């Protein structure tokens, strides 16, 4: 029998309309008494649940990180009276055939009582607010990319091949031509002549790309809708950039961490804010850089059999932080003679592009940890041969 380590605890199974709460109370070597109750997710009922836990002198409570359903419960319980843990649902699955809401609450309480919960990271309120802003920005950037793709598809459908000539259809030259295409009387020569700077060298090719197009009023409406929505999204992204910058500057810990993160090659201002919003500014929760990399998902998992190490896929980790660091790694590999570029170029022949890029993101994660943990800006290694040990 596994000895209990917590004598008064609660397991909470959260849902959209109801929560089931199981309180376990008993000495470490004794069989605990159990009480299970159901509450609605209305604030009044959540306060009653909180009072019930107080009456039972619960010192710890745990719930699964199910969507955003845990947040209202956490808001009520997070008053400093008890330790509230958040558990990864993949780590606390109940036995097959035994899954009900009440049983899940009992199972969570049992795991917590015996110290078998690996708590998920819950950042402080300021970091959570920054996370809301940076994640919202990422979502809007994705929406903007979708609108650009819709415009590109319409152009392909009507035989307008601007994308084969211009490196960026949504650069200054491309936008000038898209605007001109909204006028039925505009000729290919007139549209092509709107190219600016280096794109003017491509005017003969642009005329050919526009010749014989099949643009109708229907297609113009589709493009106009996408372009209007794209303009709105870009305004929102600009406003979010301002709000993110102000939020970081307002909170000292976030501001210091952001400045330290920007000392790592490839991590710029917005990316620094986004990654700090995921990891938090305090690295004491991670014992070393490898733990941070495992949490983010930039290091390979273990796959050892018969004493031999085989290729291990990276862990799932935090998809938001992982995506940011992979993007930063790609940027860092293009900075001439940077530590990241040398590391990537050394690995690419053996691992190919994607695994080498993930490995470079792992390198950036270790550099980020070093800067945040020591409180000193990261200084690049000038050696040609690098390791991530």
Report the location of each language-model feature.
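A detector of single, family-specific signature residues
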Residues: 1-389
């Amino acid at each position: 029998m596994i000895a209990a380590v917590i004598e008064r605890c609660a397991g909470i199974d959260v849902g959209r309309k109801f929560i089931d709460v199981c309180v376990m109370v008993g000495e470490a070597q004794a069989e605990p008494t159990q009480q299970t109750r159901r509450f609605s997710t209305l604030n009044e009922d959540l306060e009653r649940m909180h009072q019930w836990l107080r009456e039972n002198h619960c010192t710890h409570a745990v719930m699964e990180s199910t969507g955003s359903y845990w947040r209202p419960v956490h808001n009520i319980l997070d008053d400093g009276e008890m330790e509230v843990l958040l558990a990864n649902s993949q780590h606390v699955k109940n036995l097959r055939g035994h899954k009900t809401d009440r049983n899940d609450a009992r199972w969570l309480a049992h795991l917590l009582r015996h110290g078998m919960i690996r708590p998920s990271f819950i950042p402080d309120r300021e970091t959570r607010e920054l996370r809301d802003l940076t994640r919202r920005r990422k979502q809007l950037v994705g929406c903007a990319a979708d609108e650009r793709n819709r415009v590109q598809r319409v152009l392909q459908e009507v035989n307008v091949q601007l994308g084969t000539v211009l490196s960026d259809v949504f650069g200054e030259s491309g936008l000038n031509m898209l605007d001109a295409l909204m006028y039925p009387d505009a000729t290919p020569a007139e549209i092509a002549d709107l190219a600016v700077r280096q794109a003017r060298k491509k005017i003969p090719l642009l005329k050919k790309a526009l010749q014989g197009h099949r643009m109708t009023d229907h297609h113009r409406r589709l493009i106009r809708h996408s372009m209007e929505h794209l303009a709105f999204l870009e305004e929102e992204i600009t406003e979010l950039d301002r709000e993110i910058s102000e939020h970081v500057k307002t909170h000292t810990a976030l501001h210091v961490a952001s400045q330290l993160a920007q000392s790592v090659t490839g991590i710029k201002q917005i990316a620094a804010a986004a990654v700090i919003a995921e990891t938090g500014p305090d690295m004491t929760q991670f014992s070393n850089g490898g733990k941070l990399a495992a949490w983010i998902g930039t290091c390979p998992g273990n796959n050892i059999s018969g004493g031999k190490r085989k290729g291990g896929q990276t862990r799932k980790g935090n998809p938001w932080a992982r995506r940011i660091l992979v993007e930063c790694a790609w940027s860092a590999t293009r900075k001439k003679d940077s530590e990241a570029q040398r590391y990537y170029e050394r690995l690419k022949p053996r691992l190919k592009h994607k695994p080498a890029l993930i490995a470079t993101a792992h390198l950036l994660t270790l550099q980020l940890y070093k800067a945040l943990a020591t409180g000193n800006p990261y200084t690049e290694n000038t050696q040609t041969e690098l390791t991530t040990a």
